[in-house]
């Protein structure tokens, strides 16, 4: 009971907890990206760490957040067209917390996080609707037959795994051929009627994301909103280990959610994603 009380007490200060988890994910992301443009990052890290160790108690500025933001900005400047989509989300989340460190108004921070989540999820919907390849079901069909989706479930079925390996080998062999030959391959389906299933899955994905975006916009703290949001995150993780992106969405949900049980679920998702990122089982 004592530990449950401590957990509940920790979850009640959801902004502080979300900030700590954000730093955790930031640390993993920055560590993985540290080798990129190191000549710029070394002085930033040196000055940031030196300032944090010696003057953090005498300085009102959030040194850690400023350091992380500058490191993210370096990657953005040099690899604008190559960084992951959630790099932008990470920057805006850090910027929101950085500004919060000065104005100390939770309502402004939570509104910024809410708007960011709505934009991210709604943009994902628009992007999917504008992609003929996605809306036709070709994306899901190709990725499933290659084993890029639902791989963790496919591994439990040896016969399905063999089909995936066969399809992957066919693609590899095709890439080795002269493209002027205009040769082609035909995939073996991992599941019967995978073409129809892919189209259904497309519309289920779009509808769920649209519902979540609308719910976050109008009812950001509702229990039902976060039930749908958490279900969406878990569904994506079951499909593919997009751990970096899902960790950020979960942290955003933690900022807004008032239900202790769902807060705990968000925390578990973030920690799980963090472990998968460190062990390189997930995507950073």
Where are these regions (language model features)?
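Alpha-helical membrane-anchoring segments
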Residues: 1-284
């Amino acid at each position: 009971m004592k530990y449950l009380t401590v957990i509940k007490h920790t979850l009640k200060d959801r902004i502080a907890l979300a900030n700590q988890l954000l730093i955790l994910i930031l640390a993993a992301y920055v560590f993985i990206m540290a080798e990129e443009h190191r000549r710029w990052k070394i002085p930033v890290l040196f000055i940031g760490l030196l300032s944090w160790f010696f003057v953090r108690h005498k300085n009102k500025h959030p040194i850690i957040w400023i350091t992380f933001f500058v490191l993210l900005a370096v990657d953005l400047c040099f690899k604008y067209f190559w960084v992951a989509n959630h790099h932008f989300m990470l920057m805006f989340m850090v910027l929101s917390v950085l500004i919060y460190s000065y104005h100390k108004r939770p309502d402004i921070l939570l509104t910024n996080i809410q708007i960011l989540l709505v934009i991210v999820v709604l943009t994902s919907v628009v992007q999917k609707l504008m992609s003929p390849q996605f809306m036709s079901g070709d994306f899901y069909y190709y990725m499933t037959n290659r084993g890029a989706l639902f791989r963790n479930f496919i591994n439990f079925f040896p016969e399905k795994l063999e089909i995936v390996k066969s399809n992957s080998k066919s693609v590899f062999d095709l890439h080795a051929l002269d493209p002027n030959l205009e040769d082609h391959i035909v995939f073996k389906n991992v599941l019967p009627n995978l073409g129809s299933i892919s189209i259904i899955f497309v519309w289920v994905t779009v509808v769920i994301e649209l519902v979540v975006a609308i719910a976050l916009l109008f009812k950001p703290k509702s229990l039902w909103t976060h039930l749908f949001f958490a279900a969406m995150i878990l569904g994506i993780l079951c499909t593919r280990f997009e751990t970096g992106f899902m960790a950020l969405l979960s942290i955003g949900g933690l900022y807004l959610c008032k239900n202790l049980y769902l807060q705990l679920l968000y925390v578990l998702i973030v920690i799980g994603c963090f472990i998968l990122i460190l062990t390189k089982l997930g995507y950073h």
